[in-house]
Amino acid sequence: VRVSLFVSGCRHHCKGCFNSETWDFHYGVPFTEETQDKILELLKPGYIQGFTLLGGEPFEPENQQVLVHLLKKIRETYPQKDIWCYSGYLLDKDMQPGGAVYTEYTKEMLKQIDVLIDGEFVEAKKDLTLIFRGSSNQRIMCLKDGEFAGMWQK
């Protein structure tokens, strides 16, 4: 069992997106300290394995400053719980210095994440038999200190 946060704002606009209402950066309710406190409270029980960050697009530059603070707080409070993140951006291209979404917060955000599922959803590559991803182009990667550490194995 996991706790999940769906963020608002996404520029990918993938055809067939399961959550297209979150493309709008103003969708939903503002993220507040109370929201963070609620997430931390929900993560407390031992049966909660970890936290998943989805969207929308967590790595949109507008989202990174708030999210890095949240992820660091989760990591500090619950070091035994894992953090997964879904992003349509590519780790080895867009999230590197000079990449499309690289900001002063990107590296620190990546350092908090254990498993990153990257790549846009591609409807033509949709495969319902895949676990934890919607299309075959998406990769499930383990991260260590913000760097690629191998492909995730079930």
Task: State the predicted function of each range.
Residues 1-13:
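N-terminal pre-triad scaffold of radical SAM enzymes
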Residues 19-99, 104, 108-109:
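Conserved Radical SAM active-site core
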Residues 70-75, 126-154:
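P-loop/Walker A phosphate-binding loop and immediately adjacent motor/lid segment at beta-alpha junctions
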Residues 87, 120, 144:
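Residues at the C-termini of beta-strands that transition into short coil/loop
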Residues 103, 109-111, 119-138:
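Flexible, gly/pro- and Lys/Arg-enriched active-site loops
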Residues 114:
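Receiver (REC) domain switch/active-site residues of two-component response regulators
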